[in-house]
UniProtKB/Swiss-Prot annotation:
Keyword RNA-binding among UniProt keywords: no
Record remark on domains: The SAM domain mediates interaction with EF1A1, and functions as an autoinhibitory regulator of RhoGAP Activity. The polybasic cluster is required for activation and mediates binding to phosphatidylinositol-4,5-bisphosphate (PI(4,5)P(2)) containing membranes.
Record-level GO cellular component terms: actin filament; caveola; cortical actin cytoskeleton; cytoplasm; cytosol; focal adhesion; membrane raft; nucleus
Protein name from the UniProt record: Rho GTPase-activating protein 7
Chain spans, region Disordered: 120-181, 296-329, 402-439, 491-552
Subcellular location, principal: cytoplasm
């Protein structure tokens, strides 16, 4: 057995590393730091008490990881310290969900705000010990880790069968010398009796059990340092032997033989009672073998409609540790390091409950519904009619609902729901195999051709599979034919060419398909919270004349025209009570905390309900934040351009022409029957694509067919380099609708949405709100959420598509049209349809802060970081008396200090704009970089300052309104301006204290402003917090000036990663627009003189 010890140690180290990574990204970084500093084991009961605001699932997910680390600490296993990120990326902002911990930025340590013993379980005084001292708790003024390093003593268990185990433990006084590095954990290092099988971790005693043991320190005559040195040498020798053995051992011809349990020497009856050992023979023949329990089916964790009470038992016995999902070991390895709360492994009732639950799950699997498809159905198209029923095997036959196969003697009955007739039985063609008629009801799904067991095509045309449907189908086809003739009469062009091979018609009746979605029947008045008409005319849109130079970046830089869609914004304006709960109103620190909580919640739900091999840690936050080389998209403007590139170019994730297409459909085409279902014309759709690529600023859709525009919109999402839900998270979205129960899907999908990148989440919100308007007109267009989902889900999830360039490994090669569709593909298509329909129906609830965040003590509300008042700004200055003028003067001095030091410490950053871009990390405040953009402008400093102060509308295309609230002096004022956002997201509201200077050395000018809280400024949108904004204008000769713009702002509703990837590009684009405003003005003046 000893030869397996190195492998076991390596696997345990991997498990500990993954547990620490999970703790960091879910808001528990303090525990990962404690483990790396060898301050484990900790008392899990006290951790539960500290996080009592979390629900049961989240607590179990946390305790599983802590229990794993406790066992690893007992085994004296260390992991490599957490590596810092590269210099060009921000370190992750320290963030803990619990409000009882604080991060000391000077020492980079976590410490507690109040005394709380978290490291050792409470225990009775040990008899014979000279002192009853316990671990001291750290306060907010000193690091807890340093405090523990000075007072905690080490104990080493060399062997559980040591003859000195009955000696009393000596707890040293606080004055006794201890070794800081080795005084952290109790280690188990048995040299000869260590069992190296895969389940050896779970047999280790817990921290509470260790407290009942007593260990001898063999007197005080032996030096502590010598003991520590010998212990480290022993550990190092074990590591060297293990690594050498793992590299050179020959493969064994015989399988690993594990003997029966061997009672160690010295294990008397008292110890057996402490370990809860039970005699197997005492079970009276009714026992259940432990290996059978470990090999049992995981069906109890995969059911999709089980109640919460039933699933609790399932999760308690079937949730593995993270590392077991990433390696392929024997089935008995699936319970390594799991946390079982209130579960007695030797309880007979526990085994009986598990067996009974598995039997119930096998007997009544909920997903036994099938859809009947007519025999003249054309593969690849939507059937004319569908009816649902269920398979009922007759006799002794059994059905495997996971794979769709069934086995048994010769007959299979098809029972129709709500049918009073006796079921008709049909003989199968072969008793050894089944032929399943599985036709897809989604576009993009190739038609399936069934094969018999011999590999030949099954002749189903001569076999009457659905005789009961003949009469019904006859009438349905006749009515469908009448509807088609009526719709063709009113269509603009009778061309039957399909624009896309994947576009297929779906039933026009809202009740014809039931895909397990609760339809939310909404009227237009329900969607419009402000009383505005959904189809109210927009303000007239003038096409501005292009004024750029026609060369360089001005040809590829987007959008001098902004779409202003006020009716769409006002129809989804939240009520006053729910404004603070909207995601787009949260600060960057709150978004960071909310993302960690969402990952915690999603992990808990997926581990509870999904099979062990269906989920993992690959979709966690650091994975999709990994920096990837992005290809160049200079030759593309709309189609095939990532959403991130759109943000960097124009400040909005959706191109203007795509937004205009959505507005055209919403204002003029909601009454078109079968919108997004009926196909457009290929030639016209191709012409629309060319119009979008050539003139992305503005595209006139007047007179275009609604079906052509809708198909073009579907093509836009299909042509994105990755799905809207991203490659990393698409599978998670599908798993939610495959395994998570209905009553918990909403909170699971809200958590998954919070893990999306900001631009993907904003586009998803815009699209879902738009589709909710389409379903509001269901009486006219007959498009329910389910019908829309059938048509759009393949495009949004990129289902059933061939692997493309730059796509992730998840997009696998799909089967060709002549092959049999894979069961996984069918399950994913069904889950995607159900998921999209559910998100359309519940779109108003998906983008709100969970109510659970209000229970995070004060850690969430404290992160709001509102702008300060004038009086509070005055207190930031060191001068007395406190006044905002002193604060402004300090800002001016800081600006010229940067100039004097020639901007030392700034890091250059690449950008596509014709400007120099750099950044500087700031340790204070929220996790936001300070960005700097520099450009040369063909104007004098005074002219540029006037353009910035009085003529913002000439260069800011997003400006909606601006006004001066209060004039404080000749060079200082309170200024408010509002910028437009992509509909239906609310506008951005700025209220700033700004001051300017013109009498600076060398003829320079400066404009400085920062956000301020002013009672006379009305709220006109989401209030932005500008922490720092500076304009420095220096003359550089020949009538030109050097414009330097520095900014650090919290725009609300964005993650720290968004500011790292996109905000700097927006700063560079702003100075380019200021320069272009002067270039265009000079060009116009020359044209006027030439005339």
């Amino acid at each position: 057995m000893c030869r397996d010890e190195p492998d076991t140690m390596i696997l345990t180290q991997i498990e500990a590393k993954e547990a620490c990574d999970w703790l960091r990204v879910t808001g528990f970084p303090q525990y990962a730091q404690l483990y790396e500093d060898l301050l484990f084991p900790i008392d899990i009961a006290l951790v539960k008490r500290e996080h009592d605001f979390l629900d049961r699932d989240a607590i179990e997910a946390l305790c599983r990881r802590l229990n794993t680390l406790n066992k690893c600490a007992v085994m004296k296993l260390e992991i490599s310290p957490h590596r810092k990120r590269s210099e060009d990326s921000d370190e992750e902002e320290p963030c803990a969900i619990s409000g009882k911990w604080t991060f000391q930025r000077d020492s980079k340590r976590w410490s507690r705000l109040e005394e709380f013993d978290v490291f050792s379980p409470k225990q009775d005084p040990i008899p014979g010990s000279p002192d009853n001292s316990r671990l001291q708790s750290a306060t907010s003024r000193e690091s807890m880790l340093t405090d523990l390093s000075e007072h905690q003593e080490v104990s080493s268990i060399r062997s559980l069968s040591s003859t000195s185990s009955s000696a009393p433990t000596h707890v040293p006084h606080s004055g006794e010398a201890t070794t800081p590095r080795t005084n952290s954990v109790i280690s188990v290092c048995s040299s000869s009796h260590f069992v190296g099988n895969e389940d050896s971790f779970s047999s280790l005693p817990s921290p509470k059990e260790l407290s009942s043991f007593s260990f001898s320190m063999k007197g005080h005559e032996k030096n502590t340092k010598s003991k520590t040195r010998s212990l480290l040498k022993r550990m190092e020798s074990l590591k060297l032997k293990g690594s050498h053995h793992s590299k050179h051992k020959a493969p064994s011809k015989l399988g690993l033989i594990i003997s029966a349990p061997i009672l160690q020497e010295g294990m008397d009856e008292e110890k057996l009672k402490q370990l809860n050992c039970v005699e197997i023979s005492a079970l009276n023949g009714n026992h259940i073998n432990v290996p059978m329990v470990r090999k049992r089916s995981v069906s109890n964790s995969t059911q999709t409609s089980s109640s919460s009470s039933q699933s609790e038992t399932s999760s308690a016995v079937s949730t593995p540790s993270p590392v077991t999902r990433t390696r392929s070991l024997s089935t008995c390895n699936k319970r390594v390091g799991m946390y079982l709360e209130g579960f007695d492994p030797f309880s007979q009732s526990a085994f009986n409950n598990v067996t009974e639950q598995n039997y119930k799950n096998r007997e009544s699997y909920p997903e036994d519904t099938v859809f009947y498809i007519p025999e003249d159905h054309k593969p690849g198209t939507f059937p004319k009619a569908l009816s649902n029923g269920s398979f009922c095997p007759s006799g002794n036959s059994s059905v495997n609902w996971r794979t769709g196969s069934f086995h048994g003697p010769g007959h299979l009955s098809l029972r129709r729901e709500n049918s009073s007739d006796s079921p008709k039985e049909l003989k199968r063609r072969n008793s050894s195999s089944s032929v399943s008629s599985r036709m897809s009801i989604y576009d993009n799904v190739p038609g399936s051709i069934l094969y018999s067991s011999s590999g030949e095509l099954a002749d189903l045309e001569n076999e009457d599979i659905f005789p009961e449907l003949d009469d019904i189908l006859y009438h349905v086809k006749g009515m469908q034919r009448i509807v088609n003739q009526w719709s063709e009469k009113f269509s603009d062009e009778g061309d039957s060419d399909s624009a896309l091979d994947s576009v297929s018609p779906c039933p026009s009746s809202p009740k014809q398909i039931h895909l397990d979605v609760d339809h939310d029947r909404r009227t237009p008045s329900d969607l419009d919270s402000t009383g505005n008409s959904l189809n109210e005319p927009e303000e007239p849109t003038d096409i501005p004349e292009r004024r750029d130079s026609g060369v360089g970046a001005s040809l590829t830089r987007c959008n001098r025209h902004r779409l202003r869609w006020h009716s769409f914004q006002s129809s989804h304006r939240p009520s006053l009570n729910s404004v603070s709960l909207q995601i787009n109103c949260q600060s960057v620190a709150q978004m960071n905390l909310l993302q960690k909580y969402s990952l915690l919640k999603l992990t808990a739900l997926l581990e509870k309900y999904t099979p062990s091999n269906k989920h993992g840690f690959s979709w966690a936050v650091p994975k999709f934040m990994k920096r990837i080389k992005v290809p160049d998209y200079k030759d593309r403007s709309v189609f095939g351009v990532p959403l991130t590139v759109n943000v960097q170019r124009s400040g909005q994730p959706l191109p203007q022409s795509i937004q205009q297409a959505m507005r055209y459909l919403r204002n003029h085409c909601l009454d078109q029957v079968g919108l997004f279902r009926k196909s457009g014309v290929k030639s016209r759709i191709q012409a629309l694509r060319q119009m979008n690529e050539s003139a992305e600023d503005y595209v006139n859709y007047e007179g275009q067919s609604a079906y052509d525009v809708a198909d073009m919109l579907k093509q836009y999402f299909r042509d994105l380099p990755e799905p809207l839900m991203t490659n990393k998270l698409s599978e998670t979205f599908l798993q939610i609708y495959q395994y998570v129960p209905k009553d918990q899907r909403l909170q699971a999908i809200k958590a998954a949405i919070m893990l999306l990148p900001d631009e993907n989440r904003e586009v998803l919100q815009t699209l879902l709100y738009f589709l909710s308007h389409v379903t509001a007109a269901v009486k006219e267009n007959q498009m329910t959420p389910t019908n829309l989902a059938v048509c759009l889900a393949p495009s949004l999830f990129h289902l059933n598509t061939l692997k493309r360039e730059n796509s992730s490994p998840r997009v696998m090669q799909r089967k060709q049209s002549l092959g049999k569709p894979d069961q996984k593909d069918l399950n994913e298509n069904l889950a995607a349809t159900q998921g999209l329909a559910h998100m359309i129906a519940e779109c108003k609830k998906l983008f709100q802060v969970p109510e659970e965040m209000s229970r995070c003590r004060n850690s969430y509300t404290e992160q709001e970081l509102k702008p300060l008042t004038l009086e509070a700004l005055g207190h930031l200055s060191n001068d007395q008396p406190a006044d905002y003028r002193h604060f402004l003067q300090d800002c001016v001095d800081g600006l010229f200090k940067e100039v004097k030091e020639k901007f030392k410490g700034w890091v250059s950053y690449p950008t596509s704009e014709q400007a120099e871009l750099s950044y500087k990390k700031v340790s204070e405040g929220p996790p936001l970089r300070l960005w700097r953009a520099t450009i040369e402008v063909p104007a004098a400093p005074e002219e540029i300052l006037k353009r910035l102060l009085k003529e913002q509308h000439l260069w800011d295309v997003d400006l909606l309104d601006s006004k001066v609230i209060e004039i404080l002096d000749s060079q200082t004022e309170i200024y408010q301006y509002v910028q437009n956002s992509m509909a239906p997201h609310p506008a951005r509201d700025y209220v700033v204290l700004r001051t300017w200077r013109t009498n600076l050395p060398r003829g320079a000018c400066a404009l400085l402003f920062t956000s301020v809280d002013h009672d006379r400024a009305p709220v006109a949108g989401v209030r932005v917090n500008v922490l720092l904004s500076r304009y420095l204008i220096e003359p550089c000769g020949s009538g030109k000036s050097k414009l330097t713009y520095m900014c650090r702002a919290d725009l609300r509703g964005h993650m720290p990663e968004w500011y790292t990837k996109s905000f700097g590009h927006l700063c560079a684009a702003e100075v380019v627009k200021i320069r272009d405003s002067f270039s265009n003005q000079s060009t116009e003046s020359k044209d006027t003189r030439s005339r």
